[in-house]
From Swiss-Prot:
Protein's name according to its UniProt entry: Probable inactive beta-glucosidase 14
Signal peptide bounds: 1-23
Chain residues that bind a beta-D-glucoside: 43, 145, 190-191, 334, 405, 454, 461-462, 470
Record keyword Hydrolase present: yes
Alphabetic keyword roster: Disulfide bond, Glycoprotein, Hydrolase, Signal
A GO term for molecular function: beta-galactosidase activity
Provenance organism: Oryza sativa subsp. japonica
GO biological process, one term: carbohydrate metabolic process
Pfam family, one: Glyco_hydro_1
């Protein structure tokens, strides 16, 4: 391990020397700053029919042919349902002080509000939460991370029906009542601004609805359904916050927010139309949800482009939104890209930003915007972290913020072994760069209070299945063995404040490094 760490140290020193940036250290962040890892129920738990759990929308979707790139599913995933104590020990040895996870709606309420609370599901999450607390790890809980009971899709169409607002409020209150005495941080939803587009515009995610030219699905309307679903999520969020504020927050002392996906955008060309394209891309991104929640209505750019396709809030709904403002914003940031205008210029269909009438690009004049990662749509562009955090700081009056996801992907296939993944210097460089950028934003006044690496373990990555690996720990999916990657040692040393403070005892090693 000592030799391996020396390789990491030399690599990071070299990269910093070449880039001219300073090393990042734990002392550059506030003492009470949360540092953790993130996950979600469907991606790690497995046990999909155990403990009287009901079917979720993702249980059904992944069993349909052609929905997942490698034909896989989350039936077993990382088997966190049975191995959660082992995973808590990994977190404890890593040195994190928080763990962000989600609660499986179908494990707690197999039939939504149309059935009983499942005591086996409650027992599992009580055991997980208690295990974390005993190790000094703060639970940071997402109420809904994509998965909903299949019953609700079957009964009334899931997020396309206003009925789901009642179900989500009921589920949220069950969670507050059962777990809120130990949970100090709640997020209602995880990045619905991204998942809704993939679910109802492109058809990549459950329930797989879309229409041409966005995709060729059996059912759906890509021009209308994403905004209907998004509207119901915003109102569901407001209702859940209202329940928490009025009945639980005073005695439980927690906070509640929402997590959104935030890609940072730069103009492809420094022209008026591409600068406007950046503005539209941002408005159709996190601001699609944050503007109504914090400012009372949808962004002007969305209304101008979508017209009557964008639902309207009633006066009563606006009052509810204004009276239930969140305590913090969660930002999931992975990458930066260029965008060009598609209103005055011909474009291909962009799977994420077509509704904003922009097209995303990852190189300009043959030069990549940043180093590619294992995910084709994520590039390593650290400056985007500071730019994005600063933008949302200014737009939303410096609302307290947590970086709820940030991570690096390695491409994977069945012929690769653990050794192909454990020497993950690319991940170390990525996290280091983004933390440097985040620390700069904090020094300039951004009220950021936590950072979570995605993810603790390699896991099921939605429509990509197991072809992408984001974990600090490698998971062998046949044996489920967890193996630390080099980034584990890096993150541990960062958290203990010893990163890059180790001195070379052998001056010849330093000479060798300088000539590397």
């Amino acid at each position: 391990m000592a030799a391996a760490w020396l390789v990491v140290l030399l690599t990071v020193h070299r990269l910093l020397h070449l880039s001219g940036v300073s090393a990042v250290d734990r002392s550059q962040f506030p003492p009470d700053f949360l540092f953790g890892t993130s996950s979600s129920a469907y991606q790690v738990e497995g046990g999909y029919l155990e403990g009287n759990k009901g079917l979720s929308n993702w249980d059904v979707f992944t069993h349909k042919q052609g929905t997942i790139e490698d034909g896989s599913n989350g039936d077993t995933a990382n088997d966190h349902y049975h191995r959660y104590m082992e995973d808590i020990e990994l977190m404890h040895s890593l040195g994190v002080n928080s763990y962000r996870f989600s609660i499986s709606w179908a494990r707690i309420l197999p039939k939504g509000r149309f059935g009983d609370v499942n005591p086996d599901g409650v027992a599992f999450y009580n055991a997980l939460i208690d295990g974390l607390v005993q190790k000094g790890i703060q639970p940071f809980v997402t109420i809904c991370h994509y998965d909903i009971p299949h019953e609700l899709d079957e009964r009334y169409g899931g997020w396309l029906s206003p009925e789901i607002q009642k179900d989500f409020s009921y589920f949220a209150e069950v969670c507050f009542k059962l777990f809120g005495d130990r949970i100090k941080f709640w997020t209602t939803f995880n990045q619905p601004n991204l998942s809704i587009k993939f679910s109802y515009m492109d058809g990549f995610y459950s329930p797989g609805r879309c229409s041409e030219p966005f995709g060729k699905c059996a059912l759906g309307n890509s021009s209308i359904e994403p905004y209907v679903a998004g509207h119901n999520i915003i109102l569901s969020h407001a209702n859940a916050v209202s329940v928490y504020r009025n009945k639980y927050q005073g005695k439980q002392g927690g906070q509640i927010g929402i997590a959104l996906s935030i890609t940072w955008y730069e103009p492809f060309r420094n022209t008026t139309i591409d600068l406007l394209a950046v503005k539209r891309a941002l408005s159709f991104g996190a601001s699609w949800f944050l503007d109504p929640i914090l400012l009372g209505d949808y962004p002007t750019e969305m209304r101008e482009v979508l017209g009557q396709s964008l639902p309207k809030f009633t006066s009563k709904q606006k009052n509810r939104l204004q009276s239930t403002k969140l305590d913090f914003i969660g930002l999931n940031h992975y990458t930066t890209c260029y965008v060009k205008d598609c209103i005055f210029s011909p474009c291909e269909i962009d799977p994420v930003n077509a509704d904003a009438r922009v097209f995303s690009l990852y190189e300009r004049d043959g030069v990549p915007i940043g180093k590619a990662t294992g995910a084709p749509f994520f590039h390593d562009v650290p400056r985007g972290m500071e730019e994005a955090v600063t933008y949302y700081k200014q737009r939303y009056n410096n609302t307290p913020t947590y970086i709820t996801e940030n991570g690096y992907s390695q491409a994977s296939n069945s012929n690769m072994t653990a050794k192909d993944f454990t020497n993950d210097t690319g991940r170390i460089t990525y996290i280091q760069g983004y933390l440097i950028s985040l620390a700069s934003a904090i020094r300039k006044g951004a009220d950021v209070r936590g950072y979570f690496v995605w993810s603790l373990l390699d896991d099921f990555e939605w429509n990509f299945g197991y072809t992408l690996r984001f974990g600090l720990y490698h998971v062998h999916y046949k044996t489920l063995k967890r193996t630390p990657k080099l980034s584990v040692d890096w993150y541990r040393k960062f958290l203990t404040g010893s990163l890059l403070r180790r001195k070379f005892r052998d001056e010849s090693q330093l000479h060798k490094f300088n000539s590397y």
